[in-house]
UniProtKB/Swiss-Prot annotation:
InterPro entries recorded: TBP, TBP_archaea, TBP_CS, TBP_dom_sf
Similarity section: Belongs to the TBP family.
Record protein name field: TATA-box-binding protein
Organism lineage: Archaea, Thermoproteota, Thermoprotei, Thermoproteales, Thermoproteaceae
Species assigned in the record: Pyrobaculum aerophilum (strain ATCC 51768 / DSM 7523 / JCM 9630 / CIP 104966 / NBRC 100827 / IM2)
Signal peptide location: none
GO biological process, one term: DNA-templated transcription initiation
UniProt GO MF annotations: DNA binding; DNA-binding transcription factor activity; general transcription initiation factor activity
């Protein structure tokens, strides 16, 4: 039973950064030409980096939310670049602030069709209501993620706190579905038999 196995790609990492100091956003907005700051509409200052392509929401309290990173290395580089930018423009921020990943979103492909009707009966913490949403919602307990599974084999994984969590969750899901006999992998143009038929 050879198959391509699962693949995935990280689409977005959301992280919070605690700079540990209060910031003068008005002053920063004046000094940083690329900053967007309109306190009547939004209380934070918005900075967009191009390399890596990341957006940062910076708040007066010294908290920062970074979105758009595709991997943890890009996130680290972006935080370093943002800290340098803030320091260069008068903010007294630490060089190595506390960074915490809040959510990683990844899209993937199991490279096999999934029998969602059967999968929902066999997986714990799964919900499938096709008249409301075409995917099965699976809450995996370890790692703690939520995976949307579609009949085509496409998946979306959310809630991971590290790249390792994503890799573990995707492989674990694939193995579980394979063991349950609800994956249909095309091999030589023919669909593999259902697990029940192999018994």
């Amino acid at each position: 039973m050879s198959s391509k196995g699962p693949s995935y790609r990280i689409e977005n990492i959301v992280a919070t950064v605690n700079l540990g100091v209060e910031l003068d956003l008005e002053q920063l907005a004046e000094r940083l030409t690329m900053a967007e700051y309109n306190p009547d509409q939004f209380p934070g200052l918005i900075l967009r980096l191009t390399k890596p392509r990341i957006s940062a929401l910076i708040f007066r309290t010294g908290k920062m939310v970074c979105t758009g990173a595709k991997n943890e290395e890009d996130l680290k580089n972006a935080v370093r670049a943002l800290v340098k930018l803030l320091k260069d423009h008068g903010a007294d921020v630490p060089f190595d602030p506390e960074v915490q990943i809040q959510n990683i979103v990844a899209s993937g492909n199991l490279h096999a069709e999934v029998d969602l009707e059967q999968a929902v009966l066999m997986l714990e913490n799964a919900m499938y209501e096709p008249e409301q949403f075409p995917g099965l919602i699976y809450r995996m307990s370890s790692p703690r993620v939520v995976i949307l599974i579609f009949g085509s084999g496409k998946i979306v994984c959310t809630g991971a706190k590290s790249e390792k969590d994503v890799a573990t969750a995707v492989q674990k899901l694939y193995n579980q579905l394979k063991e349950l006999g609800v994956l249909y992998v095309e091999e030589g143009g023919e669909e593999l038999e259902e697990f029940e038929e192999e018994l």
